[in-house]
Amino acid sequence: MRNIKIEKAVQRPIEQNEIEVVERKGIGHPDSISDGIAEAVSRVLSQTYKEKAGHVLHHNTDEVQITAGESDPKFGGGQIIKPIQILLTGRAANEFTLPSGETKKIGVDTIAIEAAKKFLQDTIINLDVEYGTVVECKIGQGSADLRDVFQRPNTIPSSNDTSFGVGYAPFSQTENLVLKTEELLNSKDFKKQYPFVGEDIKVMGLREKEDITLTIAAAFVSKYVDDVDAYLNMKDELKNIVNDLAAKETDLSVKTLINTADDETKKDESGYYLTVTGTSAEMGDDGSVGRGNRANGLITPNRPMSMEATSGKNPINHVGKIYNLLSNEITREVVSDVEGVKSIDMIILSQIGKPIDQPRTATAHIQTEEGYSINDVEEDVTRIINKWLENITDIKEFMLEGKLRTF
């Protein structure tokens, strides 16, 4: 029997709070770039390990540090003066043993650097990766006891730590709007139509009773902005686009503010949020893994959260990754499939050395719809939790295929 517990939630629904704060750091924010690189390196290493060794070997690449460069954005152009410095650290197996006893080497540094550069090329479209970045790899090899767990690929892995993951569903209107705003502004179709908007977009949502204020910091790409008037017109256009989205996504009142640090008395570039590449990493904003969005893509101080970084951790036995992703999948399925469940949040706690499908506890807190009790939904919720735990190694395949969000 697994340690699954279903309880009635004691906190009131998020919608009944007068104040709600929700944040998302867009894909071009330096912290998100760090997360994305870490996860890209882990995914490519995992695929390489599986191809060469037959299974994923030990690694954790969740230590990426970005040190900002220096740039000189100008209306209609600009230049990079000093490249962005990117340091890849962590641990990864650099060899494996064949059944014959022969040892084969794996070029971890080369693989990691190539994965990082490809992520940057695919994500920050105005960044010349070769000219504008310096990527250095200092990934070492893990200890023998950690590597040994990965030599038993057909067993349920043992938990690498005593840690926990959390998840909840459904999103509130504010959470949904914040997430969809950033996703729209960073979508490929949007970038084709509005290339002046860079990828470094931070959306902060504040709900005060029935009123939402979205404060958006959006890096504009200087070569697409001719002068101050063009910048201000583009900012108004962006505001209208966000307001149109908000009208479709929520019935609450929404006020949109963009680049509120701008000084509109200035007639040159110094008063406005301009970048050469579309990310503030080019000129003064550093980044680190785990300092931004949680595994569901948001930062939500009104909700249960884990401080664990999910990006870059191995998908085999690192419960700091697996349990956060698992909690998100479980809660979404429960809300979608179990009649009578209004909302759910849950926590899954591991115990170091124990099988990851046997957590110390998997506890769900449920708010039921009117007319339903915990007894009415307990069996179905337990069944879903048990199903996901029973098939917990599927998370590995989802991660290798890039199907799950980690930031």
Swiss-Prot record:
Enzyme class, first EC level, given as a word: transferase
Documented EC number(s): 2.5.1.6
Name of the gene: mat
InterPro entries assigned to the protein according to its UniProt record, in alphabetical order: AdoMet_synthase_2_family, AdoMet_synthase_3, S-AdoMet_synthetase_arc
GO biological process: one-carbon metabolic process; S-adenosylmethionine biosynthetic process
Reactions mediated catalytically: L-methionine + ATP + H2O = S-adenosyl-L-methionine + phosphate + diphosphate
Species this protein is from: Methanosphaera stadtmanae (strain ATCC 43021 / DSM 3091 / JCM 11832 / MCB-3)
UniProt name for this protein: S-adenosylmethionine synthase
UniProt keywords, alphabetically: ATP-binding, Magnesium, Nucleotide-binding, One-carbon metabolism, Transferase
A Pfam family that the UniProt record links to this protein: AdoMet_Synthase
Gene Ontology terms for molecular function: ATP binding; magnesium ion binding; methionine adenosyltransferase activity
Binding site for ATP: 140-145
Record lineage: Archaea, Methanobacteriati, Methanobacteriota, Methanomada group, Methanobacteria
